[in-house]
Amino acid sequence: MTQATPQRIAIAGASGRMGQMLIEAVLDTEGVELAVALDRAGSPSIGQDAGAALGRPCGVTITDQLDALAQADCLIDFTRPEGTLQHLQACLRHDVKMVIGTTGFDSSGRAEIKVAAQKIAIVFAPNMSVGVNATLKLLDMAARILNSGYDVEIFEAHHRNKVDAPSGTALIMGETVASAWDVALPDVATWTRHGDTGVRKPGTIGFSVVRGGDIVGDHTVFFCGTGERIEISHRSSSRATYAQGAVRAARFLARQDNGLYDMQAVLGL
């Protein structure tokens, strides 16, 4: 009996915190192998072994050459929107599938990903955590039940270095509630409050943001009624959960044709 060929994985942002966790997750997962490690041009990590900083040399050298993706089956990318879109074009050139965990895209960037998914298979999700995606299912259920007489507020907290707000996870939570209410999030979202705001408008969804320290990611959705309050929370204590979910998404794509998928599809939820 012949052994199946491992899925060849590429990691973008290989020297960063998330990139290193992704590399470790790939090294720890059966059925996949690290084939390419990408980093930005000028990075001091170029030319180094991708696993050296983990104490696990793996024989894959970090490079800034996007054409190295020709040696991969799937790219996992948790970088910045502008970098991810460059990587997307390289994946299209080399017919490489893609897992995108990057957040902060504008409507144009999201549209570009959607168009690309007509030619390659893509998992695009703001949060790869299994727990977060289970939380989204709970939110959908709660929002369908608590659709009248309850005010919804979404609180999120992240580390001081996160550059986009609200987080992608908070936004998808808001979209989940809005969808259950059969409305569009932009039509009901309240992004900021300051000064004399007047009374709260029924049917709106408020957002609150904290940035500080090394908070990995906290999210709570409040359903506030008269005489009671329901809170649905998820707290991440390690980025490892995102890395493990991303590798799981890559394994899912190995069996998929072209198209745009989310983590709900990956997990069969």
UniProtKB/Swiss-Prot annotation:
GO terms for cellular component: cytosol. Its EC number is 1.17.1.8. Its main location: cytoplasm. (S)-2,3,4,5-tetrahydrodipicolinate binds at residues 159, 168-169. NAD(+) binds at residues 13-18, 39, 101-103, 125-128. The active site is at residues 158, 162. It is an enzyme of class 1 (oxidoreductase). Pathway: Amino-acid biosynthesis; L-lysine biosynthesis via DAP pathway; (S)-tetrahydrodipicolinate from L-aspartate: step 4/4. It catalyses: (S)-2,3,4,5-tetrahydrodipicolinate + NAD(+) + H2O = (2S,4S)-4-hydroxy-2,3,4,5-tetrahydrodipicolinate + NADH + H(+); (S)-2,3,4,5-tetrahydrodipicolinate + NADP(+) + H2O = (2S,4S)-4-hydroxy-2,3,4,5-tetrahydrodipicolinate + NADPH + H(+). Pfam families: DapB_C (PF05173), DapB_N (PF01113). It is found in: Cytoplasm. Signal peptide: none annotated. Disulfide bonds: none annotated. One of its GO terms (biological process) is lysine biosynthetic process via diaminopimelate. NADP(+) binds at residue 40. It comes from the Bacteria. Belongs to the DapB family. Catalyzes the conversion of 4-hydroxy-tetrahydrodipicolinate (HTPA) to tetrahydrodipicolinate. This is 4-hydroxy-tetrahydrodipicolinate reductase.
